[in-house]
Amino acid sequence: MGAASGQRGRWPLSPPLLMLSLLVLLLQPSPAPALDPGLQPGNFSPDEAGAQLFAESYNSSAEVVMFQSTVASWAHDTNITEENARRQEEAALVSQEFAEVWGKKAKELYESIWQNFTDSKLRRIIGSIRTLGPANLPLAQRQQYNSLLSNMSRIYSTGKVCFPNKTATCWSLDPELTNILASSRSYAKLLFAWEGWHDAVGIPLKPLYQDFTAISNEAYRQDDFSDTGAFWRSWYESPSFEESLEHIYHQLEPLYLNLHAYVRRALHRRYGDKYVNLRGPIPAHLLGDMWAQSWENIYDMVVPFPDKPNLDVTSTMVQKGWNATHMFRVSEEFFTSLGLSPMPPEFWAESMLEKPTDGREVVCHASAWDFYNRKDFRIKQCTRVTMEQLATVHHEMGHVQYYLQYKDLHVSLRRGANPGFHEAIGDVLALSVSTPAHLHKIGLLDHVTNDIESDINYLLKMALEKIAFLPFGYLVDQWRWGVFSGRTPPSRYNFDWWYLRTKYQGICPPVARNETHFDAGAKFHIPNVTPYIRYFVSFVLQFQFHQALCKEAGHQGPLHQCDIYQSAQAGAKLKQVLQAGCSRPWQEVLKDLVGSDALDAKALLEYFQPVSQWLEEQNQRNGEVLGWPENQWRPPLPDNYPEGIDLETDEAKADRFVEEYDRTAQVLLNEYAEANWQYNTNITIEGSKILLEKSTEVSNHTLKYGTRAKTFDVSNFQNSSIKRIIKKLQNLDRAVLPPKELEEYNQILLDMETTYSLSNICYTNGTCMPLEPDLTNMMATSRKYEELLWAWKSWRDKVGRAILPFFPKYVEFSNKIAKLNGYTDAGDSWRSLYESDNLEQDLEKLYQELQPLYLNLHAYVRRSLHRHYGSEYINLDGPIPAHLLGNMWAQTWSNIYDLVAPFPSAPNIDATEAMIKQGWTPRRIFKEADNFFTSLGLLPVPPEFWNKSMLEKPTDGREVVCHPSAWDFYNGKDFRIKQCTSVNMEDLVIAHHEMGHIQYFMQYKDLPVTFREGANPGFHEAIGDIMALSVSTPKHLYSLNLLSTEGSGYEYDINFLMKMALDKIAFIPFSYLIDQWRWRVFDGSITKENYNQEWWSLRLKYQGLCPPVPRSQGDFDPGSKFHVPANVPYVRYFVSFIIQFQFHEALCRAAGHTGPLHKCDIYQSKEAGKLLADAMKLGYSKPWPEAMKLITGQPNMSASAMMNYFKPLTEWLVTENRRHGETLGWPEYNWAPNTARAEGSTAESNRVNFLGLYLEPQQARVGQWVLLFLGVALLVATVGLAHRLYNIRNHHSLRRPHRGPQFGSEVELRHS
């Protein structure tokens, strides 16, 4: 009833077991139909002569009953309906009654004498008839038994697996699930099919199987068997049967272990460490078959020599138009070529050779049928045109040939010599059919290649079918015998099943299984009560048969090359075996054929000897572990399981898709960049319309290709670049929104950025000032408290309040985009760019490492401002008013250097005056930046840069976005900068920053467009700033003739480091808090009612700043910072400010610099340039730690280089602050300057000023309690900090920082 592929047929059983296998009844008991009196036993004498007449009478009656029962079973199995089940029930009950009356009669007449009969065939006949099996049971119990068989068969045959959340798409075992297991290489899809089938079928079968076991045992005990398993084993007529099998299994085990190790290695190459453990069992769903019993369907993954001709001829069969009928005709012709019988007309007229297309439910499991009328023999098979099925066809035709040859024997002898014989016959022929020589003869192989590599390919393919099956063929009945005997109780059904499967097969369940599952039931033979050890026996026998028949056919050479096609001698020898049926002991029949009466694995081992040796050599060469010592290992579940199962896993298709995306994206992104540039350099309504159109085109393209990207499962791709590109494309970003919402979102973004860019503030006389350059210059140069306050407040009142109405909807859309792309909120989406699960913790550690230096800088600057503005406006124990630090956002403080210079009499280190005096222009600034990069051996900017960039603010009246930005036009040659450059040292530094972006663009321009980004966003920000660290050194400014001296001495160094700290250290808390605020807005912990209050809470907490005038919830001060309305994440700048010092330290080392880090200038160092270029060339193609390692030699972000750079200044600040008795921090956190109090007193009488916010008294009281707690914590922290700094001072250095992430610099990145 089938061989190892799981597509197996029926073999003729003894009448009781035959009837058992035919019983399929309705759920509810019904009255038993009466047996026709003409079929009842008559009167016979109780002697051997009477027994002969009894046997003859039984034979004629049995043929009638068995024909009727088989017809009913056939009708049901080829059309599963309630009516057919009812008719089958009636026929089955008749069969049982027949077995009962004849069996009891045999016992009554011959029980004491039958074993002494002289006629051996008669002994076998009477012995068979007297075994009643289920017919021993009383009617009610018999009906219960039949009902269990019926329901188990129905559950298995109608089981389906439905696609998750799509009830309309359901898969049957055959062909859908079978095809998936055979052809899919998607780990998740295979898992879903495997788990779905085992759950759908196994779980409901368990209680039925438990009941079946109890009733079946009860029935066979009445026939003097200890349990059902003992009855099954009795067919093999050997008291040492189990021991013989164990001996044979151990003979074959080394070959299996070598095959297992080799296949496991191949699967590891495909699925990786995550899913395949080279020292563990193989997940059961990866081997090409639902039960991992034969592995030939994964031959393409394990083929030893893939350049040799393909031995899987499936594609040729399809190409040549083979169909099911033709496959059976080819098989028939093989049998007749041996002189065996052709199929009778009834076979072709009545068989079901394909799955019906008329909607009928059928039992697809392949099976061969004997109708016991000596002319009607059929096959039921849902045949698919594949090479594997061609072997199954020969297997089933082998059963039918057996039926034809023994059809004239007594019905009780119409069986194989033992059950394994019946399974072996068709497979013997399949061993010839599958040879390359035979495939060539039947037109399925163009030519036969006779060399060792082709032989190894062929033998490995055969081993995947034959050797892989052996432990499975052995263990199934090991488990059932344990169940029947009681050694395996129901509470351990599944545990023992998987114990055996791991022990013998070396496989494991791919998902957690427990005793609610019944995974044995997912195999046809368990619910259909078909013994399975026959297949193990047949796999040994068939090679013994093959060896003997090849000898008869005169074959010379290796056994695996033998083809007995057209050998009449072999056919005659085989016919003798078939015609004997089970009329003689199987040992005698075997000896007649092979010369030995014992099962023996020698012929099988001879057949596979070449590949056995090859596998051993391969495994030794690869250092494979034979076996699975880590037997408890289990694979994890895939991400997004089970939703992501129906995904494409073909890497070649993915490669073509990526190429298509890259080609089309470059064109579209170039067009979008042009439209965006036109708008940013000439803000008009017409330009905004064009930009929105192009933005929609980009979104549509992103949606189209992102949607296609989502159809790929990249988890097991071997090409890491394709994997990385597709994973990135799967994030659809804003394109995931429905068209109307996308249009609204784009409009909100455009409106917010336009509002920001076009805003200006006006005096009462009507004179108006834009942010660039007027307000920026005022904030940088004015030292008038009220003038600074007017500029600061007016900008926020004008811009922030105008942005606020858009912002809540922007947040809502941003979160919706993130969630639709699989993130928890927009903040989660932004953080994902850093590919770190610990990003927030790592950033916090870095911030904490730098906080002592910032607190010392803050205290020192506050003292200097107190000297200038007095105690009315500066509290030495409180926060600093935010408008006094030289910058609209107090993010960098270098513009107030003149107020805070440690040694004012030391030479000036600001090159602005010299630049103006020498007639520097914006173009000259960028030429010098370009020269710096080329001095390192890096690329010069192309001509397009100079022709198309906007390097200063236009004077033709155009409105432009002045915020500096670098642009990549995605054509490999057009790169531009947009900057309203002023001739000053700050803009010289910014120019180097922006040229850093351009250099990055040029270095990675040949990568796929998806990789044309920084390793992480902070990397892109850091590159230009690295150059600025060298450019800012007095040594380099002197080389540009911008300083009169290189400068030297302690005071000069401290002045220089102070100026750098006002840029770099002052910026750290600001760059950290902006996205702290936005992330909390996105996750909902900051609501729109508290936008401004929480903004100032963070600015107080991290920067130690307060608003100089009261702010209310009607204000929206975050919106006054470009990156907030422009939707540009900001933590990249924090990252870049950390990592630029790590890079600087590494490049200085490469340049051979010795001495303090702050004096290093890498100008003209080709070694430093190469180090940097190698990292930039990677773009986004590798995770950022790899790029970090290329430059610094290690993969982590760390503040140590930054601390090292500022070490002399840190020590000076600690000394200076101690000398003045400065407070570190701002314990009087609720203080506000007089301006705030004055304005606050004129406000509405029922509101009070709190932290510069204008709140209800109750709100303020709650806030005071919160801040009281913070104050106490800050006081404790301050005491600890003082102690820490004391220790630092004593040891002449700050503590080495904890290794963690890194950050970047303060200019908008526009290239994506």
From Swiss-Prot:
Annotated Peptidase M2 domain residues: 45-629, 648-1227
Binding site for chloride 3: Y834, R1132
Signal sequence extent: 1-34
Cofactor: Zn(2+); chloride
Chain intervals for the UniProt region annotation (Juxtamembrane stalk): 1220-1261
Binding site for chloride 1: Y236, R534
Cysteine disulfide links: C162-C170, C364-C382, C550-C562, C762-C768, C962-C980, C1148-C1160
Catalyzed chemical reaction(s): Release of a C-terminal dipeptide, oligopeptide-|-Xaa-Yaa, when Xaa is not Pro, and Yaa is neither Asp nor Glu. Thus, conversion of angiotensin I to angiotensin II, with increase in vasoconstrictor activity, but no action on angiotensin II; angiotensin I + H2O = L-histidyl-L-leucine + angiotensin II; bradykinin + H2O = L-Phe-L-Arg + bradykinin(1-7); substance P + H2O = substance P(1-9) + L-Leu-L-Met-NH2
Sites where the protein binds Zn(2+) 1: H395, H399, E423
Phenotype on disruption: Mice display low blood pressure (hypotension), elevated serum potassium, anemia, urine concentration defects and gross renal structural defects. Male mice also have reduced fertility: sperm show defects in transport within the oviducts and in binding to zonae pellucidae. Mice also show impaired metabolism, characterized by increased energy expenditure, reduced fat mass and improved glucose clearance. Expression of isoform Somatic in testis in knockout mice does not restore male fertility.
Molecular function terms, GO-annotated: bradykinin receptor binding; calmodulin binding; chloride ion binding; metallocarboxypeptidase activity; metallodipeptidase activity; metalloendopeptidase activity; metallopeptidase activity; mitogen-activated protein kinase binding
Activity regulation annotation text: The dipeptidyl carboxypeptidase activity is specifically inhibited by lisinopril, captopril and enalaprilat. The N-terminal catalytic domain, but not the C-terminal catalytic domain, is specifically inhibited by the phosphinic peptide RXP 407.
Physiological role: Dipeptidyl carboxypeptidase that removes dipeptides from the C-terminus of a variety of circulating hormones, such as angiotensin I, bradykinin or enkephalins, thereby playing a key role in the regulation of blood pressure, electrolyte homeostasis or synaptic plasticity. Composed of two similar catalytic domains, each possessing a functional active site, with different selectivity for substrates.
Complex formation: Monomer and homodimer; homodimerizes following binding to an inhibitor. Interacts with calmodulin (CALM1, CALM2 or CALM3); interaction takes place in the cytoplasmic region and regulates phosphorylation and proteolytic cleavage.
Name of the protein: Angiotensin-converting enzyme
